[in-house]
Amino acid sequence: MITPAPFPIGRPRRLRRDSFTRNLVRENTLTAHDFIYPVFVVEGQGQRVAVPSMPGVERLSLDLLLPVAQACVELEIPVMALFPVIDPSLKTYDGVEALNPDGLIPRVVRALKKEFPQLGIMTDVALDPFTSHGQDGLPDTRPENEGYILNDETTAILVQQALTQARAGVDIVAPSDMMDGRIGAIRQALEAEKLVHTRIMAYSAKYASAFYGPFRDAVGSASNLGKGNKKVYQMDPGNSDEALREVAMDIAEGADMVMVKPGMPYLDVVRRVKDQFKVPTFAYQVSGEYAMLMAAAQNGWLDREGVMLESLLAFKRAGADGVLTYFALDAARALRKA
């Protein structure tokens, strides 16, 4: 137990007296190296489509994404995370387009790694952008199991999706689907193909959250999902012990890094995971978190830069080693001028 000196011997405000002292004793800091920048990519040329529910975020074709990648390199943001916007005509029950070696994501990965080999590229392993029903896996078609997502059958497809991405040269595959056992299956498949340097960032504690709405708008899966939900595979927001079990399983199965999603509503989970496992731990400041802060800032209710940086610092204070954030570019620029 820490016993502070009693007042007036102890005056905590001494260490808040001026900026040099505050900088000297600051316990947690932000740098651009803490950020992973999620981006939405579409087919075509010259395509720039705003996401209305995420002010400032756009879906970009590859030619317009290249300057964004250049900005990440210049700002020293280490990783860009790709999320595809798939043509509705390619969406199927089984999401087979996710396995296309010449599909959108593999082509973008190859182009980015050719132009910017020093920039880390991360890809999403899940079927929801590719399925006609908007689920991350295969729905059970038996009437008595309506609404249930098949686990092992889905995992078999996810393994092939991860291999497709790894063969294209991606640095990090990030399974976000929450199927049981998928991390081990993916790791074994990568090892079998000698893709030993492909890292896995597991969405280990991904909650069935109400904060994902704008993201589903961005990737075009909201209309496919309709009134459906993902509660039979994503975690119950009331649970935190369960998160520790999920993380433990993923580490044992071969995950290099783990993630908690969403971020700010689950900072307690971030702290528990980091304290318990001492592994690289990340949080995702999801679309709903971003949209809330942007809406308040646009209405003049909050200072945009102030809440942006404070919210990101909160992740570091809670124990996160890094943050996936749509603020990455703006935050990196703000830190440079600070």
Language-model segments: which ranges?
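N-terminal amphipathic/basic leader segments beginning at the initiator methionine
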Residues: M1-R26
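Alpha/beta enzyme core
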Residues: I2-P6, D18, T31-I36, V42-A338
